[in-house]
Amino acid sequence: MIKSNYIVHDCETGGLDKNKNPITQYACVILDYKTLKEIDRWETYVKPYNDLVIEKKALDHTMVTMSDINSGVSVKKFVKTATTFWEQHRAKTKNRDKGRLVSVGHNIPFDHGFLDYALILENDTIENYFQPGFIDTLMLGKLTWGINGDEKITLTDCCARCKIRLTDAHGAMNDVEATADLFRWFMKKLRTGKATAAEVAEEVKRVKGQKFFEFECAK
């Protein structure tokens, strides 16, 4: 069995179109494949690149400022640092492709699109670092709570249903921390077939060791 770790990540962006709008902020945490404990984390702002447009409504939505963005790194340095970080946490296997990280996020295909655009600018691709499949907590939420069709369920909605604290929604690292807790909640259900409030609260204490995260199953 390949022991690939999980990467939970999130991009804040200058709009909704990966071909027109850039990444403005990126954050990720690495989780141990078995215990789901956090191994490492990294976050950064990214300077504007490739003449892509940063829309005002996107800044208003994410609460990221131009001052934050201009304090960030170039896209070249972002890609180099990100790929080095991802590579550090690749599982050690004879077949390097099998050791790639398992990507986790809320509506993660959205983030993948923006990340791949940035990597392609540097003659690279996310396929070199992440497994072909991914785990989308948005889809897990829709399946768990019977939400059909094209209706979306936000990270805020999912966290509210599971009593997970989410502060400063749309701040990249805050979203990542909440998504990681949401992922742990789903994994608890998958691994045990149940997730009572007491069991999940105990699981988070064991995994995180941080009391300020509220985490219990919705009634």
Where are these regions (language model features)?
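A structural motif
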Residues: 148-160
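Acidic donor-binding loop at a coil-to-helix junction in glycosyltransferase catalytic cores
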Residues: 174
